[in-house]
């Protein structure tokens, strides 16, 4: 049986949205056990008597909050739901760690408690984002686990993302591109020029450089980038999308009757667009390169994204993603 | 544990972690200058030291540890 360790206290809607999502996904994942870490009384109250099978609660007394400094928090708040869950995974009792809490602290739990896979230089954070071309979206790695990157790291991240795209997203021979400031081979600073050369020498389906405006077009299934650029890029995409949607809604609803009628007529088209850019069904961002999948979903998430993230984690466990990485990186050392 | 035993354990740990020759590890070896250790390497090392020696190294103390010799001295003086 697979086991997922869940920090039930992370995020704005904890623990209710988390427990509700677990109860919703449980009948679908019959070979999976869910261990919830957090305030025992609060969690218990949310679980009906007849739905307690394959559910365990482990009581913890502290919570890591967003304002906590990540490394200090995981070293000091030893009885926090996140740290106790991470140690549970480290001990081998669960195969994956899931949280909606402080991203930095979760990354620190992954890197320092669960630990790096031997041969992996640096773990990296990878979400799946929507694209215009494909309903499957694309992966971008690293979006901020590393402030400083080396060319060799980018190659390992591409390899890990490649396994993920093949095994979890079912993409055959995924295309891999390097995010750069131009499409030509010699573009970029020394880090990106060297990364380009190294990526070209791999057996990955590397299609070269792409620029920022190519990302959402879906020019590649996997975009590799240094953590600094990746983080800035992700925030720019999220921020731009949010502003456009807000302005669109505002201009349709606050400009008299005609735009309102227009919006009503355009509703099926707008709904289809919304569905296409529905990020919830892609699940959470995964920290790849540590000894168990560590997965983060947005702190504001309601049941739906949490539900899909649990399905995504279950698939990673079924495909033994970490086992594949261990085999691969022990050979390449 | 004697100073020599502590040194040997730490040297083994560093040799494995940073893939460098065990013979090249001396007490003067500086984590940042000689190993090119960044903050992730350093925190990993400190947590590894805590696990290996069953010691708790507070952040303020950890920040002061710059060489292998200083780490050996710290572990020796904080043994249970």
From Swiss-Prot, chain B:
Post-translational modification: 4'-phosphopantetheine is transferred from CoA to a specific serine of apo-ACP by AcpS. This modification is essential for activity because fatty acids are bound in thioester linkage to the sulfhydryl of the prosthetic group.
Residues bearing the modification O-(pantetheine 4'-phosphoryl)serine: 39
Classification via Pfam families: PP-binding
GO biological process: lipid A biosynthetic process
Gene Ontology molecular function, alphabetical: acyl binding; acyl carrier activity
GO CC terms, sorted: cytosol; membrane
Protein name per its UniProtKB record: Acyl carrier protein
